[in-house]
Amino acid sequence: MPSISVRRLFDDNQYKLQLAWAAGNSGADNRIGVEADKPVLALVGHLNFIHPNQIQVVGLAESEYLNRLESGETGYQFGDLFDISMSLVIVANDLPVSPGLRDYCHKNDIPLLTSKLESPYLMDVLRIYLQRTLAASSVKHGVFLDVFEIGVLITGHSGLGKSELALELISRGHSLIADDAVELFRIGPETLEGRCSPMLRDFLEVRGLGILNIRHIFGETSIRPKKILQLIINLVEADDEYMKQLDRLSIRTETESILNVNVRSVTLPVAVGRNLAVLVEAAVRNYILQLRGKDSTREFLERHQTQLKENEQNHENRPD
């Protein structure tokens, strides 16, 4: 199961969530991970001794209860209630940290952080962060682009011209997200997000030209940090025989399964004289039309059937 350390969570969210260490620094390497019987959203919650979360957040009500606990009003001790499995405690709302809580976290190597933000907002941000960070992931070979605001993954065997095609699309105003190794994360039941590793960000390798820094050549708008994957365009090498056998009126919808998510796919034959950049743009425009309920192939076939019926009726009504 994927997991991250408390140290990484702190580094990634220190400024956004105004986090600061209060105790338990020795537990910075504690792991926060997905459990088989719990969704990611259940990792974070207000202080709960019955159904404890890995990240326990102390808000106004929880802070008041801890103060009563420390004063002896409840008849319980800290050790009686805190003998639970947790990776991190965050005191929100800029509240003072209870001395008893600080001592307990220090003795048991449980990281204790503070935040000036209100607890509901804090938990919402952490849930979104953990959902993205702990998402199931896979790496696909290809070039990932933003074409007309649609995330398009171009795949195919080496040497078919994927990078050259990507370069032409970028020169036409579209944006590069990742080249060669596209990192895909399932951030929702039916949603894949594509990203680029920090090592490869901004770069595109083109045979004969070497490695190009797309951001420096084409400007800031030529690069996108991430995008939802919506369409896969698979390039295949085609000869005359392949082109003859190609179904030119196919109404089947092709999909490819990645991380148990079905993604719409289109196969484009690569042959001499074909303008692939124009074909990719047309495929994306056609996909957008289909999202709006318009299918050109079905529309043509319906028109064809209507014309045949009209011709048949005219033939029957024609006097001998």
From Swiss-Prot:
Cofactor(s), by name: Mg(2+)
Superkingdom of origin: Bacteria
Signal peptide start and end residues: none
Record: residues binding Mg(2+): 163, 205
Catalytic residues (positions): 141, 162, 180 (proton acceptor), 248
Residue ranges of the region described as Important for the catalytic mechanism of dephosphorylation: 269-274
Coiled coil: none
Keyword list, A-Z: ATP-binding, Kinase, Magnesium, Metal-binding, Multifunctional enzyme, Nucleotide-binding, Serine/threonine-protein kinase, Transferase
UniProt-listed Gene3D superfamilies: HprK N-terminal domain-like, P-loop containing nucleotide triphosphate hydrolases
Keyword Metal-binding: yes
Enzyme Commission number(s) of this protein: 2.7.11.-, 2.7.4.-
Renumbered residue ranges of the record's region Important for the catalytic mechanism of both phosphorylation and dephosphorylation: 204-213
InterPro entries per UniProt: HPr(Ser)_kin/Pase (IPR003755), Hpr_kin/Pase_C (IPR011104), Hpr_kin/Pase_Hpr_N (IPR011126), P-loop_NTPase (IPR027417), Ser_kin/Pase_Hpr-like_N_sf (IPR028979)
Record PANTHER family: HPR KINASE_PHOSPHORYLASE, PROTEIN YJDM-RELATED
General remark: Both phosphorylation and phosphorolysis are carried out by the same active site and suggest a common mechanism for both reactions.
Protein name listed in UniProt: HPr kinase/phosphorylase
The species this protein was found in: Neisseria gonorrhoeae (strain ATCC 700825 / FA 1090)
The gene coding this protein: hprK
